[in-house]
Amino acid sequence: MQTGPKVNDLIAVILIPDKLIVIFATVYAYPVLGMKKTSQLKSLIASPGLAYLMEAHNGLSAKIVEEAGFAGIWGSGLSISASLGVRDNNEASWTQVLDVLEFMGDAVTIPILLDGDTGYGNFNNMRRLVRKLEQRDIAGVCIEDKLFPKTNSFIGGENQPLADMDEFCGKIKAAKDTQSDDDFMVVARLEAFIAGWGLDEALRRAEAYHNAGADAILCHSKKTDSTDIDAFMKEWANRGPVIIVPTKYYSVPTAHFQNLGVSTIIWANHNIRSAVKAMQDTTRRIFEDKSLINVESKISSVGELFRLQGADELKEAEKKYLPTSGKKVNNIILAASQGSLGELTRDVPKTLLEVNGKSLLATQIDEFNRVGIKDITVVRGFAKGKI
């Protein structure tokens, strides 16, 4: 299992007279213990090998991504909006997205790069967004050069107007001037290929965004082959890190992109899509069968959910912080009232009424005993001889 981003495959070339010995190995970069999340992401994207970010859309999926071995997370706008039941058209407010990100960030130790759409407004919105992301320990943000409110790139992309290039450069500069952490990443996403403008416009904008301070360029394409990416990488000539999202051209081997010099690949929406398929199949089966027989063995156990939620840690914390049996605790149960329940309490106090074959008083005593409270005083009154 991959547990870190690949740094390089070529380790050494040894020259001996009449011989050339090349040593290959797979090396992975591990986050240094205590390294800031921003520094982790910056190191990941700047590494000489091909790195990967996996999509997550809530705290649970973020934890699953980290446990799988990924070194970074893509906070997908499409996936977060879908998980909230709305369209990927800025229908979820940026503060609602921040709420989701806060849970995601708390759940993991690896960095998150937010899909920040268009920055949720102009340069001023961008400044506030960066401040709020840094407060939540989010490692970076990617913004795309389209107009607010955005539309997903795979829905009628040719009809989506691009943002004014100079205005978008202003957003990038505002973000970089606002960040308080030097390692916070601002990624500029090119939509020129999506909108049908072609290579020249993509290169013109990429150069402008790079000069404005973008830490990396995300080159987006909806073709089913990699010709857009191939052409861009050839002309870009390693002027800065390039990130790609091969959702549509998934059949192209990742080794091809490593050879091109691509920095990072984002698997952009596959957790939400797999979750949707699994939920549809399970829900349909339960509805049709009116039974759980055919699904129970195919879904996660309740225990696995508890594990992912950190139930064991809570148990240990309870032992540490909750009162123990070593500390004497007294309890008084007031059982003197007859109550006003008619014939039910004509001869007995209401505390002796039974539920499921057990009196209310006995149930109370058992519950106190269960949490270690043994010193219990019962105050009697009506029909006290029966208690």
Describe each PLM feature range:
Residues D106-L113, M233-S291:
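Catalytic-face loop-and-helix region of soluble metabolic enzyme cores
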Residues Q2-D9:
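Extreme N-terminal basic, low-complexity initiation segments
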Residues K327-I333, G339-S340, R346, L353-E354, ...:
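Conserved N-terminal catalytic core of the sugar/cofactor nucleotidyltransferase
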Residues T38-S39, A51-L53, H57-N90, W94-I110, ...:
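Alpha/beta enzyme core
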